[in-house]
Regions:
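Hydrophobic positions on the alpha1 helix immediately C-terminal to the Walker A/P-loop
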Residues: 13
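ATP-dependent NMP and nucleoside kinases share a basic, alpha-helical "lid"
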Residues: 81-87, 92-94, 98-139
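Amphipathic alpha-helical oligomerization segments
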Residues: 194-213, 218, 236
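Small-molecule kinase domains that catalyze NTP-dependent phosphoryl transfer to phosphate-bearing small molecules
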Residues: 113-116, 120-122, 128-198
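Hydrophobic anchor at the beta1->P-loop junction of P-loop NTPases
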Residues: 2
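Conserved lysine of the Walker
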Residues: 10
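P-loop (Walker A) phosphate-binding loop of NTP-binding proteins
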Residues: 5
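ATP-dependent small-molecule kinase phosphotransfer cores
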Residues: 26-104
């Protein structure tokens, strides 16, 4: 999962990861946290191909409105997307097992602390893309004051506690070519960690220390384990009957 300010290079990094995954016999699938939000916007006639400002304003307003009703609303929608992917894959495999390839799910818009927590729940690798000293497009635009930018801006201005919620931080402050070289140098390491389910080894918090004994030995089972973790999380979130 990739975090960072708007237009810092998150989607670009997601595209490069997808290319690497495809070239290494994985099936890459980009599933943004905002996928369900964008679908709702499209139903109302708002897309990136229409008025960009109106599209952004609608998405930010709808996103905030639903989070006010339930802070985890979009996280739950994301989990539903992953479950649907898994169910579709299982149906396809029953018809033709030869089509199987390990999936790599890439999320290019991790913007809130509860989204990082959701990433940890499914043992996802998390990367923060920092602008460093580079000035971003529309640096002082009003839309950058929206709550969806707050986490990334806090990290950029020195909030170490939030930055430490991510496994990696990469600076995109030079040319795109330089950033690509920096990212590509990490891909082998990232995919090894994912395949071996060793992400807990990057963190020394009490939770990760205690869970190291439960790593998956079989990388082929990672997608199935993600589903099990999501289901367990949903079961734990349900209110208990009295």
């Amino acid at each position: 999962m990739i975090g960072g300010q708007a237009r810092v290079g998150k989607t670009t990094l997601a595209k490069w990861i997808s290319e690497y995954a495809y070239n290494n016999k994985y099936t890459p699938v980009i599933v943004p946290f905002a996928a369900a939000l964008k679908e709702e916007a499209a139903k109302k006639g708002y897309t990136k191909d229409t008025n960009q400002e109106e599209y952004r304003e609608f998405c930010q307003t709808l996103g905030s409105t639903m989070r006010e009703q339930d802070p985890d609303y979009w996280v739950k929608e994301f989990r539903n997307k992953i479950k649907k992917l898994y169910e579709e894959e299982q149906t396809a495999l029953k018809a033709d097992p030869s089509i199987w390839h390990e999936k790599v799910i890439i999320v290019d818009d991790c913007r809130y602390t509860n989204e990082i927590a959701a990433a940890r729940d499914i043992r996802a690798l998390t990367v923060f893309v920092s602008a460093g000293e580079r000035e971003l497009p529309e640096e002082f635009a009003e839309w950058r004051t929206h709550e969806s930018e707050a986490l990334a801006i806090a990290i950029e201005t020195g909030n170490k506690q939030y930055e430490d919620m991510f496994h990696y931080t990469l600076k995109n402050e030079e040319t795109e070519a330089a950033f690509k070289t920096k990212c590509q140098a990490k891909f082998d390491e990232w995919f090894h960690l994912l395949a071996e389910s060793m992400l807990d080894a990057l963190c020394n918090c009490e939770l990760c220390l205690s869970s190291r004994e439960d790593r998956l030995p079989d990388g082929d089972a990672v997608f199935k384990e993600i589903m099990e973790l999501i289901i367990d999380k949903e079961d734990n979130d349900k209110p208990t009957k009295t």
